[in-house]
Regions:
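Conserved N-terminal phosphate-binding loop of PLP-dependent enzymes in the Aspartate aminotransferase
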Residues: 1-448
């Protein structure tokens, strides 16, 4: 089918996510035909670096032969089977591998199919765990402004990005939100590192106010993704974990975006020496190739669900594609590549170069802040550097950046007033230098 006909049918039937569809009538979506390695290719043969890892999930590059072969073999043997009263080798092996590499104490794995469901599972497990233990008063959650945990109802209820919540307030449950550790816009009016990370005090206050009614604290460790690519110090996370423990609340860490080496360690929470009660994983779990998610938890939580058939302690939650064998096979192949190719070490080695390259753009007009961690780097654009007034996300400059990036072979998708790179862990030094050159050229031309 030719390009024009495909796009015409797309606009007739498809409803794209996070998209004002009326704009596509004059500026249709990019028709991607194939992908290979670090690149996307459109239907006209143009090549683009996948500079946002296809929404933050790509790890080893597109079409890695090892993952492709693992998926093909599994499809030929067992494509899918329910996971209630049934098990299979890929799920058993993957659960064992995840428990082996996870932070200490996380020995139980519940599979689902995307990041939102991984978080939803953690929220429900925390609530029911307390109920099973006779602590039914613990029903509340503490979360962060600018935090984002997914688009299902529970996830939205503990998120703090207003654009995603505004239309759905009537169906959300209340949660205690505290200011984010947002160094550029410090809620305490201080400057890191001399601040003593005093912004965490608000979290302590919320836990004291909530008392025995708080079920869990939920955080994205070290990087608030959809809230603006806000990187924050490991000290905040370690103190937040200590506060949750002090007040007897569970700690849920959402590593859907940060897991699997993205920040320079296998899991971001490792940089703070933190082991949560629940760890939520997806995106990079399969190397970014197949829908799969996992919620890891402790033996203590797991044991609270054990009882007789009539005990009321069973966890009544599941998904059709729970532990899909093909997804598990992809994840196992991805984990093999981590071990064989030194993926995490490569990220740690190249992260300073990414940070250095983006810092060179700090002096450009409208650039208020430059931040990042690991393979993530972001620029926050402001209309006034003195007042830090955010540039509206609807400002024409963001469209210009996206289009200029594509002209230079970079696939970018600015988010609000933030322009960012979220690079695959497979990036080489040569490719990184090329990406930075194209990214810098894009910003300098548009913001000059």
């Amino acid at each position: 089918m030719d390009r024009k006909n495909l796009l015409r049918r797309d606009l007739r039937h498809n409803w794209h996510p996070y998209t004002q569809m009326s704009t596509l009538a004059t500026e249709p979506p990019t028709l991607i035909d194939r992908a290979e390695g670090l690149f996307l290719f459109d239907a006209e043969g143009n090549r683009y670096y996948d500079a946002i890892s296809s929404w933050w999930c790509l790890v080893h590059g597109h079409g890695h032969p090892r993952i492709r072969e693992a998926v093909t073999r599994q499809m030929e043997r067992l494509d899918h089977v329910l996971f209630a009263g049934v098990t299979h080798e890929p799920a058993v092996r993957l659960a064992s591998r995840l428990a082996a590499i996870a932070p200490e104490g996380l020995s139980r794995v519940f599979f689902s199919d995307n990041g939102s469901t991984a978080v939803e599972v953690a929220l429900k497990m925390s609530l029911q765990c307390w109920r099973n233990l006779g602590r039914e008063e613990r029903t509340g959650f503490v979360c962060l402004d600018h935090g984002y945990h997914g688009d299902t109802t529970g996830c939205m209820s503990v998120s703090g990005v207003e654009a995603f919540l505004r239309a759905f307030r009537p169906i959300l449950f209340p949660a205690r939100r505290v200011p984010a550790p947002y160094c550029y816009r410090c809620p305490a009016g201080k400057t890191h590192p001399g601040c003593g990370v005093s912004c965490v005090d608000a979290l302590g206050d919320a836990l004291r106010e909530g008392g025995d009614t708080v079920a869990a604290v939920i955080l994205e460790p070290l990087l608030l993704g959809a809230g603006g690519m806000i990187a924050y110090p490991p000290e905040y996370l370690s103190r937040a974990a200590a506060l949750a423990r002090e007040h007897g609340a569970h700690l849920i860490l959402d590593e859907v975006a940060t897991g699997f080496g993205r920040t320079g360690t296998m899991f971001a929470c490792g940089q703070a020496g933190v082991s949560p009660d629940f760890l939520c994983l997806s995106k990079g779990l399969t190397g970014g190739t197949m829908p799969l998610a996992a919620t890891l938890t402790t033996a203590e939580v797991y044991n609270s669900f054990l009882g007789g058939p009539d005990s009321g302690k069973t966890f009544y939650h599941g998904h059709t594609y729970t532990a899909n064998p093909v997804g598990c096979a992809a994840a196992l192949a991805s984990l093999d590549l981590f071990e064989e190719e030194g993926v995490v070490d490569r990220v740690a080695r190249l992260a300073p170069r990414l940070a250095e390259g983006v810092r060179e753009l700090a002096g450009l007009p409208l650039v208020g802040d430059v931040r990042g961690i690991g393979m993530v780097a972001a620029l926050e654009l402001v209309s006034d550097k003195g007042t830090k007034e955010p540039l509206p996300g609807t400002a024409p400059v963001f469209r210009e950046i996206r289009l200029e990036g594509m002209r230079r072979g970079l696939f970018l998708r600015p988010m609000g007033n933030v322009v960012y790179l979220f690079l695959p862990q497979a990036v080489t030094r040569e490719a990184l230098d090329d990406i930075l050159d194209r990214f810098g050229g894009t910003l300098r031309k548009v913001l000059r």
